[in-house]
């Protein structure tokens, strides 16, 4: 019985560590996107303020649709949906960043990236609470959130420094379509 409890504790700790890595990587990806989107739209697509406002439709409509989408996926596990959401974020960011697609295609991939991000937000908290020890839900949520915020801040600083000192640029495409 004692070995069984020790085994459960180790499994829980491993799950917490793996999910902490996922949360940190997700925060880094989110930091890369949120810290650069406005400049990306301006430099690559030369959007004005009205167009920038219009871009909020594909960026925020997944948030409105999220309740419907999550309820439609209720038969799937939180971990499975979270994994799919991260793939959506990655595909959206990679296509926009590496290929700088046409304006219309960019809006589609912005929607895809945002859909993944909006799906992950509520699942992040749900999975965090599932991984909490009894009586430590608040502490566990705080721990995950603080690490995510730290990763986002470090990423924002790296983005700032990279553009400030010329390591990053919107002018060069990594891959040409």
Please state what every model-predicted region is:
Residues 6-63, 148:
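Helix-loop boundary and gating motifs at the non-cytosolic
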Residues 24, 92-94, 104-120:
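Hydrophobic core of transmembrane alpha-helices in multi-pass small-molecule transporters
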Residues 37, 119-132:
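Intracellular juxtamembrane helix-capping segments at the cytosolic ends
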Residues 43-44, 67-75, 97, 154-176:
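Transmembrane alpha-helix termini and helix-breaking/packing motifs in multi-pass membrane transporters
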Residues 72-87:
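Cytoplasmic membrane-interface "Motif A"-like loop-to-helix N-cap segments
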Residues 87-101:
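C-terminal ends and interior cores of transmembrane alpha-helices
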Residues 139-160:
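Glycine-rich segments within core transmembrane alpha-helices of 12-TM secondary carriers
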